[in-house]
Amino acid sequence: DVFSGTGSVASAFIDKRLVVCDMMRSNYYAALCWFSPESIDYKKVEELLCYYNSYDASSEENYVSENFSETYFNRITCQKIGFIRENVENLYKLGTINAREHACIITSLFYAMDRISHTCGHYDSFIRDGKYEGCLELRMPENRYVLNCENKIYCSDSNSIAHLEEVDVAYLDPPYNSRQYCDAYHLLENIALWEKPEVHGVAKKMDRTDMKSKYCKSIKAAEALEDLVKKLRCRYILFSYNNNGKKLQCRSNAKLTDEDIIRILSIRGDVQVFTMNYRGFDAGKSELNKDNQERLFLCSVRK
């Protein structure tokens, strides 16, 4: 899974050997949580989650409360998020928890944040009515399943590691348009990295210059895809893309044409195209988003 995100596609193949990659640290932690073969002391993690849920951090200020209070969350929630993230990092540095346990707790924190965030589904902006609801509740991730001991998890630019692994199927689901994931999910990435940078503007975003994806840029997307496809070591390449085409908002326009995709995949082998209609995410505002098609381009690799 070359652009794994939170791992929804890879999870459908949980009984197989998985190689997953994403350049965002927040998604990397999710992948470690779901797919890493490292063992977990579930009793220890559950006890920590119970401790965090019952902890009163209302008298403590920290990086999160000082920078994000009364934005995506109220002050009390921000105080708790900051305390949990700092404590988890300290436990990991002390060796009290291993890498996967560390990732499980952070992933649980992200899911808890998403359930009560005062947003429309991402962190590009927040709802400014001051009506915060719900409390932060960390739950144990449901990852008690047998995993392949040869699973590999990467936090990297996909193009830089594509040549390292030999697989049966390489699934590619890159960004479709100019909307950078590091912009929409900057807060989760900030909490994941835990470097406590300065934040700016109403949305409280950190500097994301080094996090931008080439696949979101028209002049670089085709070049990046061709480089990736040439490096992959696999029997099949399954490429997912939609037909956003020309929308009223140019940011939503697809960065790769069908011609680009077929030309590039054909470098490696024969290409078939499968289509399925779907309703794009637009908060119900656009009639143009009702005729979208998800396309799957399947390349049977010959060279």
Over which residues does each language-model region extend?
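Conserved Class I SAM-dependent methyltransferase catalytic core
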Residues: S213-G269
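Conserved proline-anchored active-site loop of SAM-dependent methyltransferases
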Residues: D1-F13, V20-R25, H163-A184, S240-N242
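Conserved SAM/SAH-binding loop
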Residues: C155-S160
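A short helix-to-beta-strand connector/capping loop
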Residues: R144-K152
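Class I S-adenosyl-L-methionine
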Residues: K255-K303
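Class I S-adenosyl-L-methionine-dependent methyltransferase module
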Residues: R17-V19, M24-Y145, S178, C182-S218, ...
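General small-molecule cofactor/ligand-binding pocket signal
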Residues: V19, K152-Y154, Q272-F274
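A short acidic (Asp/Glu
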Residues: A10-F13, Y29-C33, L164-V167, Q180-E189, ...
